[in-house]
């Protein structure tokens, strides 16, 4: 045998790779094929002329505008909430953290319809005194629980203060027969069956997704940055603002985009809480529903395609940000 | 024990399952002490306790320049830290890294400029002031971290295995810079290291933790 050449007997037998590769390709192709068929079905149902006709409809144009405005408002609100919540969950170890974490995931786990139903009941059936009473009770239980487990003094003081405040408000509203909707309408922010209600209906689920994104973002930023900043004279807040927030920029954009996309797909809560009034509270998701209801299948398909286009563009932005090495 | 710029008296730390046995140490003003010991003996934990970065119960006394600092936040202790993983702020240029502390403490712009330029000259960073950390080599990044830690003229400089991960040539170069800067700035230093050679090269005294 020549030196440097391995004889056939010395080569270990390895089974061929192609069956496994074929299995992977089959599963991926089957799944992508299904998605392609779903999009294709819509495309084959509508012609260019039908699509352009429905997009010229004044009510549909209002619906598209309202969709953009409400999704953007929901995304901004979601980011404003998700940044501090995500940071708290990422950086602070406290008793009851798992409970808070689970509670924040509830909007993701629940059927969206229940969010709408809960909002409808809260704003129209529960008197403000009961709302304040519930908040006071919740804050009091959390304060007692925190005190029993020797939790952070400032947090416990805040909870006790909140319990007292909501307790007092509960007494103030005790005689009132008005609903929460009555009160917010009086101060100029009507919610139920009103465009503002669309944002409120979109917000819980969109914010829950944004919180998840922000938490992952902060988890990926080493706490060492804050520690070094703190040795240089920062307090936690300054370290967050000067060091962590600039690093979380791409994550914030991703959280906002994710919230925007979730808000775009929201349907159940909007239908129940804000309604689907043409030219008033109608958004793209409800437009599809209304077009089906009046038997205009090509119109519904054209709007579906528009929503698919928007969703795909949004997801591409997120993927693009993640691909550029952002903490997403 | 008294008179040292840093006095640790029977310091104990509990961090999760790890408990640091009572440890005492005194460092005189201007002295450079190397702290050595096997992995997991608590060198970094002790350093972080001195810097105020450890959350959790700390026993004993941590005295800096005659003041008990156990309950002071990290930024109020007057300590400069060069961490093992360097931790330069990714979005700030080299100049902004060094300015970070002085700006935060409200130094006048001309004082900041003068301090940054003086440190950049001493550390050989003059040509790098507008660069971001991603464009720096390991040795340059260490020198920037040293400049950032020294900018506020701390009373104690803590170096946590600041030379780990550097190749031999860079290691010796940065070691020389650290030694020079400690002498030039007249700063008291606590240097945590694994390397006996490094400890002997840099420190006036070597303390071994069990």
Predicted feature descriptions by range:
Chain B
Residues 36-38:
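The feature captures the beta-strand-to-loop junction immediately N-terminal to the Walker
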Residues 68-81, 104, 109:
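ABC ATPase NBD coupling module
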Residues 132-136, 140:
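Conserved ABC ATPase signature
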Residues 146:
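Hydrophobic anchor residue at the start of the ABC signature
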């Amino acid at each position: 045998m020549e030196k440097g050449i391995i004889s056939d007997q010395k080569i270990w037998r390895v089974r061929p790779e192609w069956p496994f590769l074929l299995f992977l390709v089959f599963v991926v192709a089957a799944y992508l094929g299904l998605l392609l068929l779903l999009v294709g079905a819509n495309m084959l149902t509508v012609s260019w002329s039908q699509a352009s006709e429905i997009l010229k409809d004044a009510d549909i144009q209002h619906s598209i505008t309202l969709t953009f405005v409400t999704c953007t408002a929901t995304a901004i609100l979601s980011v404003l909430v998700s940044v501090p919540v995500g940071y708290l969950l990422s950086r602070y170890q406290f008793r009851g953290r798992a409970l808070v974490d689970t509670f924040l995931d509830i909007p993701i786990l629940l059927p969206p319809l229940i969010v709408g139903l809960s909002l409808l009941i809260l704003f129209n059936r529960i008197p403000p005194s009961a709302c304040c009473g519930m908040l006071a009770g919740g804050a009091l239980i959390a304060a007692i629980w925190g005190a029993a487990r020797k939790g952070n003094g400032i947090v416990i003081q805040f909870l006790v203060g909140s319990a007292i405040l909501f307790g007092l408000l509960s007494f103030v509203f005790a005689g009132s027969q008005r609903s929460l909707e009555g009160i917010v309408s009086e101060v100029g922010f009507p919610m139920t069956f009103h465009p503002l209600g669309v944002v409120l209906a979109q917000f819980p689920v969109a914010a829950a997704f944004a919180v998840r994104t922000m938490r992952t973002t902060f988890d990926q930023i080493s706490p060492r940055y804050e520690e070094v900043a703190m040795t240089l004279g920062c307090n936690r807040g300054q370290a967050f603002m000067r060091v962590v927030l600039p690093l979380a920029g791409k994550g914030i954009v991703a959280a906002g985009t994710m919230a925007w996309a979730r808000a775009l797909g929201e349907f159940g809560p909007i239908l129940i809480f804000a309604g689907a009034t043409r030219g008033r509270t109608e958004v793209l998701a409800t437009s599809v529903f209304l077009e089906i209801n009046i038997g205009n299948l090509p119109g519904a398909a054209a709007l579906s395609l528009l929503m698919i286009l928007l969703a795909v563009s949004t997801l591409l932005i997120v993927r693009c940000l993640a691909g550029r090495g952002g903490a997403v | 024990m008294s008179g040292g710029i840093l006095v640790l008296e029977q310091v104990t730390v509990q961090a999760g399952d790890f408990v640091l046995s009572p440890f005492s140490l005194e460092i005189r003003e201007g002295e450079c002490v190397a702290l050595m010991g096997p992995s997991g003996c608590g060198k970094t934990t002790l350093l972080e306790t001195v810097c105020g970065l450890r959350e959790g119960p700390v026993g004993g006394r941590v005295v800096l320049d005659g003041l008990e600092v156990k309950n002071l936040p990290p930024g109020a202790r007057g300590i400069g830290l060069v961490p093992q993983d360097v931790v330069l702020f990714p979005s700030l240029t080299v100049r902004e890294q060094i300015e970070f502390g002085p700006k935060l403490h409200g130094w006048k712009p001309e004082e900041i400029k003068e301090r940054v330029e003086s440190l950049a000259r001493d550390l050989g960073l003059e040509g790098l002031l507008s660069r971001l950390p991603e464009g720096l080599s390991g040795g340059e990044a260490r020198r920037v971290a040293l400049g950032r830690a020294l900018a506020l003229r701390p009373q104690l400089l803590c170096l946590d295995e600041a030379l780990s991960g550097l190749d031999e040539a860079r290691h010796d170069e940065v070691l020389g810079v650290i030694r020079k800067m400690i002498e030039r700035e007249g700063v008291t230093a606590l240097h945590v290291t694994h390397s006996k050679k490094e400890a002997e090269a840099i420190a006036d005294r070597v303390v071994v933790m069990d």
